[in-house]
From Swiss-Prot:
Protein name stated in the entry: Hydrogenase maturation factor HypA
Residues that hold Zn(2+) according to the record: C73, C75, C95, C98
Sequence intervals crossing the membrane: none
GO molecular function, one term: zinc ion binding
Entry binding sites for Ni(2+): H2
Keyword Metal-binding belongs to the record: yes
GO BP of this protein: protein maturation; protein modification process
Superkingdom: Archaea
Annotated function: Involved in the maturation of [NiFe] hydrogenases. Required for nickel insertion into the metal center of the hydrogenase.
Keywords linked to the UniProt accession: Metal-binding, Nickel, Zinc
Family (UniProt): Belongs to the HypA/HybF family.
Amino acid sequence: MHELSMADAIVRTVIDAAEKNDAVEVLEVTVEIGQLTLLNPEQIEFMLDVLSEGTILEGARFNLEVVPVEIECECGYEGVVEADELDHFAPVIKCPACGGHEFHVRAGRECNVKNIKIEKKD
């Protein structure tokens, strides 16, 4: 259950950024979660709600954006590998054009706080 540690890191990151910007309240947080992280967005959202209780984050809206896997293959294919082509227990990715495994993953591994909307002190 690596969702708990990731949710904790997200909460700490957001609280730190909010405090550095003199926030009195965090209104909204947008988080990008790559498909290759194998993080469950519903579990992340639940844990974010639980971990934010009693903090400046309590009551904030969490927007979780799932980032699809994008590759650059040696065959020349550049694009998204559809989610239904992934085995969620042991992700094996292959190029949809040539079936090969020699490629660079451009997106889908990230777990980033993309945006934080705060209310500042008057």
